[in-house]
């Protein structure tokens, strides 16, 4: 099991449903300003945003590095693949990366990813993503939390240092025989300064909006157009 698959198993215990819906609404409202007929959702998760855009008449494809997430998408009849976004064929009117997907990449990987996304955009295409602010990492994401049900227990311990957030997930799930299976892994996220996004070859940063998702100004929305 990859660390992203562990996240997929634990996501329902994190209490992020309201924040996820708020992000979906924000992205959807931004895309309303453009004539989007095709969309690629990078880091599509369980496909919630694709479902919303499909209801608006947009043809959607999703990619995610969690096989569990992709399986759930396919079970809903959504077009999703478990592979790096750079390996997806075709061009799209819009590409989105929702809920700090970019923060999961180190600088060099991120720059390569952004250039590959530019290549997958139609002329005048739009790419929208959100990132955590420094405050979002140091004051909001850092810390501990736990949650449990009759069948599961989750502990999350996050520490931010040297512009990296290391989040350890420990999940216990009850088996049919009454015993518990333990899953544990660490996910690393990276803080990126806005200046990094202002010097791209294939994408032009046309708008940035710092907003509050969990707390005051903990996220920034980035809107790019293809150069």
Predicted segments, located by residue:
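A short acidic, Gly/Pro-enriched loop at the edge of an enzyme's catalytic core
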Residues: 86-95
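Conserved class I S-adenosyl-L-methionine
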Residues: 1-34, 36-45
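SAM-dependent methyltransferase
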Residues: 131-194
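A short SAM/SAH-binding and catalytic strip from SAM-dependent methyltransferases
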Residues: 94-109
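Conserved beta-strand signature within the Rossmann-like core of class I S-adenosyl-L-methionine
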Residues: 124-131
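A short glycine-rich, Lys/Arg-flanked "PGG" loop and its adjoining helix->strand segment in the class I
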Residues: 111-123
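Class I SAM-dependent methyltransferase SAM/SAH-binding core
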Residues: 46-86
């Amino acid at each position: 099991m990859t660390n992203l698959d562990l996240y997929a198993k634990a996501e329902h215990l994190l209490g992020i449903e309201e924040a996820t819906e708020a992000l979906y609404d924000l992205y959807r409202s931004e895309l309303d300003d453009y004539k989007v007929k095709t969309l690629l959702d990078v880091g599509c998760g369980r496909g919630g945003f694709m479902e919303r855009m499909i209801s608006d008449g947009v043809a959607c494809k999703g990619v995610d590095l969690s096989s569990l997430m992709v399986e759930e998408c396919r079970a809903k009849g959504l077009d999703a693949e478990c592979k790096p976004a750079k390996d997806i064929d075709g061009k799209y009117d819009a590409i989105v990366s929702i809920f700090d997907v970019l923060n999961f990449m180190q600088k060099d990987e991120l720059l390569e990813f952004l250039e590959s996304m530019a290549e997958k955009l139609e002329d005048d295409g739009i790419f929208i993503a959100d990132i955590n602010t420094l405050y979002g990492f140091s004051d909001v994401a850092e810390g501990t939390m736990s949650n449990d049900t009759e069948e599961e227990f989750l502990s999350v311990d996050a520490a931010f240092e040297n512009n990296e957030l290391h989040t350890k997930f420990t999940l216990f799930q009850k088996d049919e025989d009454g015993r518990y299976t333990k899953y544990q892994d660490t996910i690393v996220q990276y803080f990126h300064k806005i200046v990094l996004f202002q010097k791209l070859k294939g994408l032009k940063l046309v708008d940035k909006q710092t907003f509050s998702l969990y707390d005051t100004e903990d996220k920034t929305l980035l809107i790019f157009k293809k150069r």
